[in-house]
Amino acid sequence: MRHFFIALVLAATLISCGNSKNNNSATESDMPAFEQKFPQKSIWVPQDQNDSTEITFSSMEEAEWKLVHNVPHHDFSDAFVQVLLSDSSSMDYPFDSLSSENFCEIFKPVVSDDGNARFIGLKPDAAHQIPHMIVQYKNSGTVRIAKEEYPYENCFYCLTPDTVYTLNTGTSTLYLVWGYAGYTGSGNSYRLMAYELDNVGLHPASVFEGTVDINGGAEDGQSLETEICTNDELYNELVETDFRDLCYFNPKESAIYIRIAASKEADECGCSTRMTNQYQKFVWNGKKFVCGK
């Protein structure tokens, strides 16, 4: 039933938004890497299965923050974030206390004692999801997306780096975060999520036309989603390109391209979607991303 619904949604999308891009690649400038967007000591290190990973941020406010995620045996219930303040004091926050039940929802911000930073993150709700942590420095207004990737007990579920795109709206800055959104039972879901930084702070932004979300995207307009089967013939090719080929942002057009998953008869594994070489285009009109040429 779910795949039938997806097929209907996709069909409606292609009818109303028939402007797809037949292009299987994009230039490096179209797809800015994490390191290119946030080069100043925004360091992430993939971890081994039983080791911890430490990420160090150096801010302009003379504060050093260390985010330590301890995830033994892929049990995220034991994961925590340890914040070391400039006076050598520390604060520990378990993931459970920092996040909502839904991986896609943003949790209530935690403000550090000195008021310099807020910690905003997303909790994984299954073993095959990647936790995210967004660190906002209030004084400087800079935002860094910290991410970690964990090897799975089955290497078939390959790791996916997040990509962060930015768009200046004139009154605020939009952060478009592309990343792995979870295993659906027959395929992997990838989602583009929108956050806005304005004079109020950093918060989820409803900037996508809900009626044109593809493949199960959120109706609230805060994300776009696409899905790929783990046994798709294009799966290995996408692994080689870090899955950036699924979505990219063209700053010259202020447009997003998301690769379309086409529905077909379910195979022996029950998977009924296959990636195509077509992209659905969403153009920024000053207020939202809408289907367009």
Residue map of PLM features:
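Beta-strand initiation motifs
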Residues: 141-145, 200-206, 276, 287-292
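Short N-terminal edge-element motif at the start of the domain
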Residues: 93-169
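C-terminal motif of bacterial Sec signal peptides marking the signal peptidase cleavage site
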Residues: 14-16
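Sec-dependent signal peptide recognition
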Residues: 2-8
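Bacterial signal peptide processing site
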Residues: 18-20
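Short aromatic loop motif centered on NTY/YTY
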Residues: 152-191, 201-281
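Beta-propeller blade signature
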Residues: 133-139, 190-199, 275-286
